[in-house]
Amino acid sequence: MFLELKAQATSILKDAIQKAGLEIEDSELYFETSSYADLASRAAFRLASLYRQNPKELATRIVSAVEIPDGSYIGKVSASGPYINFHASRRYMDKTVATVLEEKEKFGCGAPKDKILLEHTSANPNGPLHVGHIRNSIIGDTLARILRRAGYDVEVQYYVNDMGRQIAVVSWACERFELDLSRKSDSAIADVYIKANVELDKNPEYVKEIDALMEKVEAGDVKTIDSFYKAVSLAISGIKETLLRLNVVHDKFVSESTFLKSGAVHDIVERIKATGRTKTDKGALVVDLSDYGFKKTLVIQRSNGTSLYTTRDLAYHEWKAGQADRIIDIFGADHKLISGQLRATLNSIGVKEPEVVIFEFVSLPEGSMSTRRGQFISADELFDRVTEAALEQVETRRPETSEEFKKQVAEMVGIGAVRYDIVRVSPEKSTVFNWKEALDFEKQGAPYIQYSHARACSILEKAKEEAAWNSSAEIDPSLLVEDTEIDLIKKMASFDRVIDLAARELKPHVLAIYARELADAFNQFYRFVPVIAAEDEKVRASRLALVNCARIVLANSLDTLGIAAPESM
């Protein structure tokens, strides 16, 4: 709705500027949201510099030339100093309510757009995911959901490291130590991986065995490849379980060994050589990217002729470039250098570069995490802790409900709290996940938003029981004139703007902020305006319809954030 409002404002402003005898590029209209209007333009500033005139006088001159078409979403245009302010019409409000009720879960969806291939998580299969990994998963999954709602055709991939040094250690460990298969498979892999690293630290001669395994895999030794595959499959199976609990699903798992077997790795190395930017450094083949601003060279082949993860990643990205219109990678801050080198190398051979979202790390109050040293709290343990704490709150708030209900709500609230608390922070900022704060119903996190949705459901259910509401009855949105009603309608109308902004800038936190603000607007409305208790029947019906609208947009917001929307809490 808001995007249509902006489109109409753009058309009105362009016509007025032309009628005022002025010219400006569309990109120089400079629209922004404002606390004084529904939309404001800074075009007068640009025109002032072009025509050497006072921006305030220009704004007044333009506004005097404004003509608003009948039925427009723009009700009034005014000048406030150099700013040109646009105010929504009553029609805009009424149409928003009608559109939400008509489109329901489709409200806020954009027109069909390009295909995007988005890669996220891609953690090494040497143990369970920890909280550091799941920030990648949550950012990636939320972005995929946002992009889909914006209209993009999104395929989500997990790039499986099934042949690097760490996997050689995992395979070696599985042969040397007994796996405890009574444990979750990825945890069993972590146990032997940690033992293996202790052995390797104590006995450096074992490193030669790891090197030999890597050479065998590179040479295509079937037995070694099979042992690698079995170890990786066990770890990935456990990782999938964890991701599913987090409400994260990948469309495809792509193994890096695929590109070695197909010859793609060899081909891309030869093409990079053909650019004339490779050289030998201590027997290894490196790429000089100094003209791209990188002082450090990129190693693409070891001195023994074997490829590196980076080399195989280059081949993977070349393959991805042929699968979609856009490629998006979600990487941690420790990949900032290598992702830049990867983009530069791809550019040097004429391959489409990925768009990269870099995120800083999330930690727990307990400190840092390392699978190799065995110093980590797994995502599974974190989920258990959070849902147990959520269960305590549910038992306190709803002691009369069944155990099954309490556990279901605790899982929805706990996992929702994890997802929201991590995604609400801009990716480029580091954060500490504090589960007590994340679960605080008064802190306006996921539980607060979920509770707002449940409250809307409860109001509608109560209205049905009291025969005060018929969802199919005709309503009159023009009766919704209270300030809190108008604020709520306008906040719902801006859902498509938020989706568009988050999709364009690849910043999922803006949707998290919006969802909280929407919950605020709904709760303010319910606090100050009687709904079921409204005396006028038509007003009551319209307010109940507004509650239903809020329920729909809250549910859409939560769904796009990958968070469950409970009907009762």
Swiss-Prot record:
SUPFAM superfamilies: Anticodon-binding domain of a subclass of class I aminoacyl-tRNA synthetases (SSF47323), Arginyl-tRNA synthetase (ArgRS), N-terminal 'additional' domain (SSF55190), Nucleotidylyl transferase (SSF52374). The keyword Protein biosynthesis applies. InterPro entries: aa-tRNA-synth_I_CS, Arg-tRNA-ligase, Arg-tRNA-synth_N, Arg-tRNA-synth_N_sf, ArgRS_core, DALR_anticod-bd, Rossmann-like_a/b/a_fold, tRNAsynth_Ia_anticodon-bd. Keywords: Aminoacyl-tRNA synthetase, ATP-binding, Cytoplasm, Ligase, Nucleotide-binding, Protein biosynthesis. The keyword ATP-binding applies. One of its GO terms (molecular function) is arginine-tRNA ligase activity. This is Arginine--tRNA ligase. It comes from Methanosarcina barkeri (strain Fusaro / DSM 804). The lineage of its organism: Archaea, Methanobacteriati, Methanobacteriota, Stenosarchaea group, Methanomicrobia. The gene is argS.
